[in-house]
Amino acid sequence: MPDISRFQSELVRFFSESGPGSRPVFPDVNEGDLCLWTDGSALGDARQLGTGGGAAFVVTLMAGGVEHYVISYAERLDHHSDFFDYGVTVNCAEIKAINNGLSYLQKLDCAEDATVHVFSDSAYAVSVLSKWVHVWERSERKQESCAKSGWLCADGWPVANARLIKDTHRLQQIFLRVVYHKVAGHAGYFFNEHADNLASIARNGQLSDPLAADFSWSDQKAKSVRFDYASGKIALEEY
């Protein structure tokens, strides 16, 4: 198992010497925690069949008492995806953004030791992934003996986009802890605004580079953090 303390201490040292940051906005985000700011966008609304959309996430790291930008990513969503039962809607775009972010973070060597805070302005996504997914799982276990699905809404209809929700829940279980925070949209949270902007750009097909190469802060180019366990050194890649 990788030594996450080594990873964290190296990042704290690195960021204390260089790199701009943003003050944390939530007191329960602790040193070394990863923050995942997400947003989804669709051409239709949550009740209509979408024809396409966008999903984006921004990763930050709490180090030295400051929230530091790590990387951002966005993609255009195709309504033909097997993940989407009814095309791309706002609701499934919001969950796909979280799915993409967790999928990226699970590639880290320290994923199983990491606490991830997911910030979303979607009450639906936060409620589904922090509460209802557990209700449906318990119901499914109870229904196994009679070969019925436990993934049903209160009105008896199947849960929409169940495959996407199940896959996102699978990713959640890789980490030590995943904590969800519902934030107000367009309320001045910098990284939430950035994710919202990227999702809209991706939805409109205007994003040529999914790694959002145009992002900058304090006249510095966006950087992706890489930690080499062999050398114990931090490496930054500019886009």
In which residue ranges do the predicted regions lie?
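Conserved "HGTGT" condensation-loop signature of ketosynthase/thiolase-family condensing enzymes
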Residues: A56-F57, H169, F215-W217
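Short, surface-exposed amphipathic charged segments that create phosphate/polyanion-binding patches used
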Residues: E193-I201
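RNase H-like nuclease fold core
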Residues: P2-C92, K96, Y104-K107, I201, ...
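RNase H catalytic domain
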Residues: L43-D45, H80-F84, I98-E193
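Flexible, low-complexity interdomain linkers flanking nucleic-acid-processing modules
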Residues: Q206-Y239
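Acidic, His- and aromatic-enriched active-site or binding-groove loops in soluble protein domains
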Residues: E140-W151, S200-W217
